[in-house]
Amino acid sequence: FGLTTATVYLSRFPGDKVGDDNAIPVSVVLLPDFSGMTQQQRLNPPAVELSATELTIPPIEEKAKKKLTVIVTNVGKSDLEITDLQVFNPALGVQLKKRVLKPGAKTKMKITAYGKYLNKVKGTPRVLMITNDPNCPKVIIKVNVTAK
C-alpha cells in the first residue's frame, strides 16, 4: 500500500536532453482492498479522526526547521491500523508514536518542515497516511509552508 512515484520525460525531437523542464512526475496511491471484510467487521469498523488535515506554517529560513503536531484518534469500534505513512517530497519529515490504536485511543504525529528543501518543492507539501478505516483509507495532510 502507499505512494508510488515515477518521473516521465517528454521529448519532441530525437536527441532531446532529459531535464527538469521536460519532466512530468506521476504518482499513484495504492489502497487496501476491503472486499473481504466480514459482516462483523463492516458493523464495527475503525474510524480515523485527525485534529487537522491542513497545516499552515509561516515562511521559514533555509537552515531552519519547524515542527507541528497532529493528533490521530480512533473513534471507531475496532483497532485502527496505520499501515503506511509517507511524505510526497523531502521538504517534510513525519514521525508517529503508535501505528495501532485501540478504540478511543490517540497518538501524536509529528510533522517537520525543512527549510533547505522548500525551494525545490513544486506544489503543496503533503503527508499521506494509509489506514484500515474502510470509510477513509487514504488521509492526506496538506502543509502550507514556503521558504523565506
Q: What residue spans do the PLM features occupy?
A:
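Short, solvent-exposed loop/turn segments enriched in Ser/Thr/Gly
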Residues: F1-L10, D21-A23, E62-T69, K116-L128
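Long, low-complexity ectodomains and other extracytoplasmic segments of secretory-pathway proteins
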Residues: S11-I71, V75-G76, D133-K148
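Beta-strand-rich interaction surfaces with strong enrichment in secreted/lumenal proteins
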Residues: G15, P58, L96-L101, Y114
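Alpha-helical transmembrane segments and membrane-interface helix-loop junctions
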Residues: K63, A105-K108
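Surface-exposed binding patches on compact interaction domains or structured appendages
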Residues: K77-K106
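Short, hydrophobic beta-strand segments
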Residues: M109-Y117
